[in-house]
């Protein structure tokens, strides 16, 4: 995303997003005010339909991960973004954050949602929002469950 796109996202602040899965809906609030580059990237991909018809390729007792167009954990959008962190956004149950390789600036499209607190990840991964509804859905996800679509929700 451009600096202008990130600046617009920062002005908007909190952005409601719905992740429609084969198990139900997950509602999250993205913190564009604190993580403008990361949120602008995620929203841009979502609005382009990048995440549509994807899968959760990784599910463990503490995390679910998706956003890879290949469904393997090795794919992405063809670019990476700079690591962005904020001390008030922690790796706690319900946090949504960007997955990446061992290089800090390697996130692209893959994201994770935590099913359990993982403070060990704080400061190393870009937490950019929080689930506000649908953690029961997150808890029921298994490998291969579909991400039908991700869209910015109506704020009303």
Where are these regions (language model features)?
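Cyclophilin-like peptidyl-prolyl cis-trans isomerases
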Residues: 1-156
């Amino acid at each position: 995303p451009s600096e202008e796109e990130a600046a617009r996202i920062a002005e908007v602040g909190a952005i409601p997003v719905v992740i429609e899965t084969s198990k139900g809906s997950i509602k999250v609030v993205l913190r564009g005010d604190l993580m403008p580059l990361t949120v602008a990237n995620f929203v841009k991909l979502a609005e382009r339909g990048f995440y549509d018809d994807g899968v959760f390729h990784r599910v463990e007792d503490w995390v679910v991960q998706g956003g890879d167009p290949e469904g393997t954990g090795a794919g992405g959008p063809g670019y990476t973004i700079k690591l962005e962190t904020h001390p008030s956004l922690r790796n706690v149950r319900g946090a949504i954050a960007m997955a990446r390789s061992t290089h800090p600036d390697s996130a692209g499209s893959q994201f994770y949602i935590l099913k359990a607190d993982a403070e060990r990840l704080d400061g190393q991964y870009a937490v950019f929002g929080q689930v506000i509804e649908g953690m029961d859905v997150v808890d029921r996800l298994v490998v291969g469950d579909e991400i039908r679509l991700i869209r910015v929700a109506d704020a009303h």
